[in-house]
Regions:
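Active-site metal-binding motif and surrounding structural segment of the metallo-beta-lactamase
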Residues: 67-71, 79-124
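Hydrophobic h-region of N-terminal signal peptides that target proteins for export
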Residues: 8-16
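Sec-dependent signal peptide recognition
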Residues: 1-9
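Metallo-beta-lactamase
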Residues: 43, 69-70, 77-79, 129-260, ...
Length: 278
C-alpha cells in the first residue's frame, strides 16, 4: 500500500512539473507584460478611442462610449487589470456595459478573467468559447520560436453570449455588427463594425507588424485570411478607421496593401506546389 501511495505521489509530482513546463512560455510573456507594458490612448472621434499597448505582447482595445456605458473590444491581460482600468477611466468614468472578444488568443482575451469576475457580459463567436474551455497549443507565431500553451479558462471568464455567423447589437443609435467570414486567423474570428461611427476593430484578422500569424492548429486558413481582408475592404470606405489587432489605426488602403502582398505570396506558393517545387 505504501508503494502505491508513493507511486501516486511521484506521478502527481511529475504531472505538475509537466504542466508547469507547458505553461512556462506563457508565464514568461505574462511577466514581460506585467513589468514592461504601458498604454497609449488614441482618440478616433469623440465617441471612440483605441488603447494601444507599448512594450509588451497585447492586443489593441477598442473603447466605444455611449450614454449608457462603455463597450470594449478585447481586454488584454488579467495581470494588468489595474492599468487597463486606470487607462479606461482616463477616457470615461462610465461603467463597462459589455466586452466583445475578437478571437480566443491570450493577448486579446486574458482580461476576461478579470472582467468576468465582475459579472460583465462577454460576447464572441461560438468557437471562442469552445476553445477557451480547453488547453490549446499555439505555435509558429512570427514573434516567438517556441510552442505556446494557453491553459483552459475558468467558467467565469468564458463568453456569456455567442453567435455563429453574424450578430447585430444596438446601443442607442449605434449599430454594432459582429461578423464572422469563416476561417482566417483562427476559426472563430469576429470583425466588429461600429456602423454609424464608421470604425472597424479587426482583431488579428488584420495586423501591421508584418507577415500575419495564421493559427493553423486552431482552424486558421491562409486562403481564408485573404478572404477576410477582402470582406473588410468590402464593408469599408475611404473614411473608415480600422483598428488592427496590433499596431496603429489604419484605413482601407492599408488593408488592401496587406491583402495584395498575401495574395501574391499565395499564388506563387500555389504555383510551386502545382509544379512540384519545394
Amino acid at each position: 500500500m505504501k508503494f502505491f501511495k508513493l507511486l501516486i505521489l511521484c506521478s502527481s509530482f511529475s504531472l505538475a512539473q509537466r504542466v508547469d513546463k507547458d505553461l512556462e512560455a506563457f508565464r514568461k510573456v505574462e511577466s514581460e507584460v506585467k513589468n514592461n507594458l504601458t498604454e497609449e490612448i488614441i482618440k478616433i472621434n469623440d465617441n471612440f478611442f483605441m488603447i494601444k499597448p507599448i512594450g509588451g505582447v497585447a492586443g489593441n482595445i477598442g473603447v466605444f462610449i455611449s450614454d449608457k456605458g462603455l463597450v470594449l473590444v478585447d481586454d488584454q491581460w488579467e495581470i494588468i487589470e489595474d492599468l487597463i482600468l486606470e487607462t479606461i477611466n482616463s477616457i470615461s468614468k462610465k461603467d463597462i456595459s459589455f466586452i466583445i472578444n475578437t478571437h480566443f488568443h491570450y493577448d486579446h482575451v486574458d482580461g476576461n478573467k478579470a472582467f468576468g469576475k465582475k459579472g460583465i457580459p462577454i460576447i464572441s463567436h461560438e468557437n471562442v468559447r469552445k476553445r477557451l474551455k480547453r488547453k490549446t497549443k499555439l505555435y509558429g507565431h512570427p514573434q516567438h520560436n517556441y510552442k505556446m500553451i494557453q491553459d483552459k479558462y475558468p467558467d467565469f471568464a468564458l463568453p456569456t453570449t455567442v453567435y455563429n455567423s453574424t450578430m447585430k447589437i444596438y446601443v442607442e443609435d449605434e449599430e454594432i455588427q459582429l461578423l464572422n467570414f469563416g476561417p482566417g486567423h483562427t476559426d472563430g474570428d469576429t470583425i466588429v463594425f461600429f456602423k454609424n461611427n464608421n470604425v472597424i476593430h479587426a482583431g488579428d484578422s488584420f495586423v501591421t507588424y508584418g507577415y500575419p500569424y495564421v493559427d493553423l492548429n486552431d482552424g486558421g486558413s491562409f486562403k481564408g485570411f485573404i478572404n477576410v481582408l477582402n470582406q473588410i475592404v468590402a464593408i469599408s470606405n475611404d473614411e473608415t478607421k480600422i483598428i488592427p489587432g496590433h499596431g496603429a489605426v489604419c484605413d482601407i488602403g492599408d488593408v488592401i496593401k496587406l491583402k495584395n502582398v498575401l495574395q501574391e505570396h499565395y499564388e506563387i506558393t500555389e504555383k510551386g506546389f502545382s509544379q512540384s517545387l519545394s
